[in-house]
Amino acid sequence: MKRQSEWIRVESIRGARRISNFFWAFILILGALGFLLVGSSSYLGRDLIPLLPSQQIVFIPQGIVMCFYGIAGISIGFYLGFAISWDIGNGYNLFDKQRGIVRIFRWGFPGENRRICIQFFMKDIQAIGLEIREGFYSRRIIYMRMKGQQKIFLTHISENSTLKEMEEKAANLARFMCVSIEGI
């Protein structure tokens, strides 16, 4: 979502609450539970899951490895679940021409630094850029180049926008901030 007036522009940034993350957390926990139950069945010597016979799985080494994979998968699944519930990465980019500031806000993990807020002056921005990498792990990222050649990324790596949409976003932002554009 984007809101814009003559002086202020606000862009919402989606966090971890995506359908794909819900899907992968569910699949990961379900599969890891299967591994853990089959490994535990091989230790106990009886089937904990009626559909998955475990008599042919020896506890050492296969059962131990399956238990390890199950515990690791459940841990990663819960990590992903907590990231979804805390909505890690959610936030906004605020561009205020009237006050001459740019504010980037994101939610992080709970703790002392849960709120991540970066604020700087517009006069320190040299250009708006677009970094494009095509291939198997393609990525398209809009960034701001600051004085001193530091890049500050404004979009997620996982944002699935077409090249034309990303070029338009970068051009509109550069036009709004009255800076040059690079990388297109």
Swiss-Prot record:
What is known about what this protein does? Seems to be required for the assembly of the photosystem I complex.
In terms of InterPro entries, this protein maps to:
PSI_Ycf4_assembly (IPR003359)
Q: Does the keyword Transit peptide apply?
A: no
Name under which the protein is recorded: Photosystem I assembly protein Ycf4
Q: Which terms under GO biological process does the entry name?
A: photosynthesis
Ranges annotated as spanning the membrane: 21-43, 58-80
Give GO cellular component annotations, separated by semicolons.
chloroplast thylakoid membrane; photosystem I
Family annotation (HAMAP family)? Ycf4
Provide the alphabetized UniProt keywords.
Answer: Chloroplast, Membrane, Photosynthesis, Plastid, Thylakoid, Transmembrane, Transmembrane helix
Question: Which family does the entry's similarity section mention?
Answer: Belongs to the Ycf4 family.
| UniProt subcellular location | Plastid, Chloroplast thylakoid membrane
Question: Looking at the Swiss-Prot or TrEMBL record, what is one Pfam family this protein matches?
Answer: Ycf4
Q: How does it sit in the membrane?
A: Multi-pass membrane protein
